[in-house]
Amino acid sequence: MLNPNIFHMPKIIIALDFCNKKSAMKLVNLLNPSIFYLKIGKEMFTILGCKFVKELHQLGFNIFLDLKFHDIPNTVFNATKAAADLGIWMLSVHASGGKEMLISAKKALKSFKKAPLLIAVTALTSFKEEALKEIGINISLTEYILKLSKLSNDCGLDGIVCPGKEAKKIKFLFGNKYKIITPGIRIAKDLLYDQNNIITPKKAKEYKIDYIVIGRSITMSKNPIKKLDLIIKSMQ
């Protein structure tokens, strides 16, 4: 299998969206930690907690703890610090938490010699423009994402999670140092599930996206390694 980390293509984060440890480890044991990153979201963290994060870290994996903190600044400060203590590689907060919350999260990492990347979630890939209007925000989804991207950049965060279609413009506006993580990656034959804003791996490379998050396309595959190889080859 080609290693995307040594080529000019997006690096791959596998979303461990399972309801039990046995199923998760069945996939983890097939993966090379020098090639793939792992994402732990709310489901697995709620079931298995900090211990599971530490176990995966000890296996040599870089862990993206995707808990999307969104609370008052003091709570987010303490939660961010606690998460960083786990030795994770990347951590997410919600950009819509506002300037004070984002700055508080960034401050929480100052005492760490090797702090995790702090990433702000702009809009979920399941999010539709109509949902903005329902909560009284009368701008386009693209404009909303760009505003939150600028806010996160101004607050000193390392990057954002955003749908692929906006990534190209964000890279142009904020440069290559500002990391872009994009879920909703599908190859042609994949099901969409509940995601609306999707792109192909090839487009992700074209848009200079830094990391692509792949979940159900892999976790529900009968042959996940073959599927991953297909995804990597599609980016060549």
Swiss-Prot record:
Enzyme class, spelled out: lyase
Any single Gene Ontology cellular-component annotation: cytosol
Any keyword Phosphoprotein? Answer: no
Its UniProt entry gives the catalysed reaction(s) as: orotidine 5'-phosphate + H(+) = UMP + CO2
Give me the disulphide-bonded residues. Answer: none
The active site annotation covers K68 (proton donor)
Q: What is its EC number?
A: 4.1.1.23
Listed A to Z, the keywords are: Decarboxylase, Lyase, Pyrimidine biosynthesis
What is known about its subunit structure? Homodimer.
The protein's name is: Orotidine 5'-phosphate decarboxylase
Q: Which organism is it from?
A: Buchnera aphidicola subsp. Acyrthosiphon pisum (strain 5A)
